[in-house]
Amino acid sequence: MNSRPLLVTCGLPYTNGPCHLGHLRTYVPADFYVRFMRRKGEEVVFICGSDNHGTPIVVSAEKEGTTPRQISERYHTHFSDTFTKMQVHFDHFGMTDDPTTHARTKHLVSRLIDRGYVYPKVIQQAYCIHCQKFLPDRYLEGICPHCKKPARGDECDQGCGKHLEPGEILEPTCKICGNRAEYREQEHFFFKLSGFQDWLREYLGELKGTDNAINYALGWVNEDLHDWCITRTLEWGVKFPGHDDLVVYVWVDAPIGYIGFTEEWAEKTGRDWKTYWCGENTRVTHFIGQDITYHHCVFWPAMLHGAGYGTPYAVVASGMLKIDDHKFSKSRGYVVWTNEDYLDQGLPADYLRYYLLSYTSHTKEMNFSWQLFQERINNEVVNNLGNFIYRSLHLSQKQFGGVPEGVVEQEIFDRITEAIGQVTGLVEAYDFKGAVDAILALSAWGNTYIQSKEPWKLAKTDQAAMAQVMRNCLQLAKALTLLIEPVMPERAGLIWSQLGQDSLIANNGFSAGLEPLSPGPLPAPSIVFSKIDDKMTQELDKRLRDRIDALDAEKKPKTPEISIEEFAKVEMKTGKILSAEQVPKSTKLLKLQVSIGDEVRQIVSGIAQFHNPEELVGKDVVVCTNLKPAKIFGIESNGMILAAGDNASLLRPETPVPSGTKIR
């Protein structure tokens, strides 16, 4: 066991919208890791909070006619409540807009200034003449200078993903009014990131965590690092020391929130926050989405090192999320909202936790679909784990009233010991899928064991042999319950009670899985894992499809409306086709002679692929008669035959009417 204090953090949820599955890809694995490390005896502090500053929140507040603080408080409460429902339990969940983080930010930035790592510089800043204001970050959109894709003011979100400094974006456009912005000079402050290049290269060589985070950061550090503008022209945020007209950039105060939240936790628990953030023996592990790797592996450690703080021990970055094999997109409807689409539908938090941890490697892109979700839960959780645990409890309770007398065989203890060691090694290597697979492998072995021993037959022939089998199975069930608790804590707690355990399962280490159950009665077991039926899956999938279709329909260009007076200008009459022939050298056009009562019109129509000329003669049609004459393939056309659909179905009167009758 490592004696260095362990502090685990999660990337801060931004208080500008509700929780979705993309968020949980970070928070559930972090909670799993914390629970697991505590089960193996480590003392762990689990810290997080909400990110409250930056232009998107200001823009949203302006649209709603409220304040950034009110929006932040609303979504802070939302995330806190959602995490509780998802069994993600932080020791402290703070707000970056609270006084502690404001004070810690000013202190850390002041130390960087005092040590010569921050300097002023006049730069080109986007300015909207119409709105008469400078446009930081998300107030601005334009074209990425690197990949030429559409981009936000501070990030190329639709292309290369690079961070953009003020003044870099091409074709700057104000998001408030939509007018083109211009660049004007303004003084801002820069952090000397370029001065940390050699140190960062050495630091990243020692950083623990996942390879996707470390390798991505090394790719940046091995290029030329540019100094980083750390101020913005905003009223909302942490004031830059000595300049009340500027605030620090949100990616400065957001990670400093980790320290501020630790201070708040330490104050209420009587601990010393410096134990976790100062000195060389700190062990801070950040769980993040891979889209914010640059900030956590380059900007953040350089700031900490420059200010004299300890640096992160490990960075664990999750892969991105796809919905139904489509890129995650809120604007296109490819999103699953944690509350609205999942928890509010009565689905267990534990099932979603299992899927997020077991579907694929933590660092790889994850695909979510309701069909896949149903298959994984029913086949792996219910048919494997649930089946073994319920059969073990049911047969033991039915035949012996509980745990039978006897001694667990050594083979069972060996299997449990091996599984605990294997799972522990995988978790410590941040291979969460591998760890869950190893737990399910022990359960699968248990199913094979009970099937091969056939205790239901032994009940009639050899009670002592059956007692031995069930004693072994119950010990496996106990160990499995302890191992699966970090994955599915709520269900594990229910099984723990059915195993006759009075203690909280969270207060037991994995070694308890090797402690024999006391012989004696057990309560009648109940089914803990239920299958997800086809009807529910279809309903959930329909919700997703309806959202996608609705948003897609909104984006389709609408046909411009016209007035009744404009429509009245269009003259349409019934007609009868007198002759029809193919236009030479054309596969699509027919030349028609059409009677419209008092005259015969020559009309060229693109219906040749769907109608034989000889079959058209004598047919009634509807003709637009007041179109200007046009030449098509060199032939004059005086009107238009009306047809519908891809097969050019001809429109005709319901009952015969004289040619030349007006359509009204």
UniProtKB/Swiss-Prot annotation:
Name of this chain's protein: Methionine--tRNA ligase
Keywords, in A-Z order: Aminoacyl-tRNA synthetase, ATP-binding, Cytoplasm, Ligase, Metal-binding, Nucleotide-binding, Protein biosynthesis, RNA-binding, tRNA-binding, Zinc
Q: Where is this motif: 'HIGH' region?
A: 13-23
Q: What is its main location?
A: cytoplasm
For this protein, the record's PANTHER family field holds: METHIONINE--TRNA LIGASE, METHIONINE--TRNA LIGASE, CYTOPLASMIC
Motif 'KMSKS' region extends across 327-331
What is known about what this protein does? Is required not only for elongation of protein synthesis but also for the initiation of all mRNA translation through initiator tRNA(fMet) aminoacylation.
The protein's matches in CDD domains, at most eight in alphabetical order, are given as:
Anticodon_Ia_Met, MetRS_core, tRNA_bind_EcMetRS_like
What gene makes this protein?
metG
